[in-house]
Amino acid sequence: VHLHLATTDHRPPTVRTDLAVHLAGHHEAHAVLIARTILLTMPSVRVRLAHPQPAYEAYKAWTSAADRAARVLAGAESGTVPEPDGQVSGHLRFDRPVPPAVVEALPAKLSPTRAPQLRVSVGGLLTVVTDKAAFTSQLNLWTTAYRHAARRWSNLPSVEELAAGALPRFDDIAAPALAKAAA
């Protein structure tokens, strides 16, 4: 899927994504450990994490975006979300490593909705938040998801260990599963 997001008077950048969600205000979002994976639910989207690396990429992106969110979303009481033509929902499953996450901040004057935006792309998921409440809901969601992932996969350090400088190990993540299959 190619989305063309108008951000300037020049040719709009192309954003490659499988699923995009645009969020404003506090919203219900949950992460649970179920069937040896982490299931995340938020408005219109369900994400299943079946590999540890996307959990790490998302957590790293949302926590590193806090300073940018504070700057670009300062003073934004409630963002603007385009009205969909109908009810739309999507589901993504991350069962392999994804490229590094991308975080972009757009001030209101460059935003297609004329509301400030913080965009976080992880794998095929693009999440756009337009105010501090939406950012906080997503930060809490991905922090909870990462905590579940760190309990599920032993190669992920805890949130506290990450803060102290520990790094995850992804070099042999498939080896135990392959060894079990060969036995």
Question: Each predicted region: which residue ranges?
Answer:
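Positively charged, low-complexity terminal tracts
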Residues: V1-A183
